[in-house]
């Protein structure tokens, strides 16, 4: 079965957050600036959810010439006073690092009343769990496996949360392209980054997946000190999962990657067995 969000207008995670913001800001007459990094998909959904809303601006950072022309046009042809698109020289990781740096600088973030709709915002992860419950109740199956196209590990981490809530999920399968850090981490324990290569699936052209840190936190027994030390090693590009941690991950996760030739073949040969939900 195929669970497909065909239209950006159906991006419930962003619509939910946008409506939350508008509701609570109307109560206290406050104003916020949303800063978001995108590899293509998040930006389109977030813009559609935030445009024309009162007391909100949205600034979208995308990597210059590293998103698809369709994604760029969806984002950059929106002519609303509260929507600002900014192309950044570099890749998605560079955009994401800028947003993280702004959040860490509390003087700056408070001064501009900054907030976000990336998966930095926990509300977005919670909203994404809805997909999994919808699929389960639509199929009325006893147990499901989910294969999820994965770049920043947000959607599939939401599936992990759904499983922890009690949803009967067997395996969560990370599907990624040749920027394969998540596949290497889950299959071999190798979480060292390489140079990002441009592909035909630019939304997955990411090396360091932010939400993988949340999974590391979980498998370390929710120990923030251990997680902090591990993430310091990640920043030094010197971290490999130990056998115990890898075994914990493999209880819930599997992974696979496709190179560019395999991706093109898949694009041109849709499976007749796909049944949309």
Question: Which stretches of residues belong to each language-model region?
Answer:
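Single conserved hydrophobic/aromatic residue that forms the stacking wall/gate
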Residues: 1-8, 12, 267-277
